[in-house]
Amino acid sequence: MLLVFRGETALSDFRRLPLLARCQTLWPNLDDLTTEYFFMVHAKRSLDAAEQNQLRQILGAGPEAPSQKSNQLAVCPRSGTISPWSSKATDILHNCGFDVVKRVERGIVYTFLSAAQPTTAQLAGVAPLLHDRMIEAPTRNVESLFEHIN
């Protein structure tokens, strides 16, 4: 079972504003962009409401994340890899009694604000600016990160 929770703002204005300026060189009518962490939790079974609340509290997460919109792009660790953050966070959850969690991973969702809906070409154009291609990959399907886990 996969749960996806919203997190806090991922980039401070110090990091976000220069990124916005670089994106605007490729996408001139881009007005703004926002960033938000999200947490993907792969659990062995469904979690009840109390377990979900406790899990959100440990992660510092908000409510379940809505499905990805057409003006958003998520950046996650590359498929088939486990980030150092994931290893440590999963260990912490297990030490807190959450043995039901197989793995937890963190990503960033970038939301692009523009008068017009972004095209696939625009999203593909700015994607290389958003991630380190050695360890991360942009995705429109966060569920694919856990496809190889049984």
Give residue spans per PLM region.
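Core nucleic-acid recognition elements
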Residues: 1-150
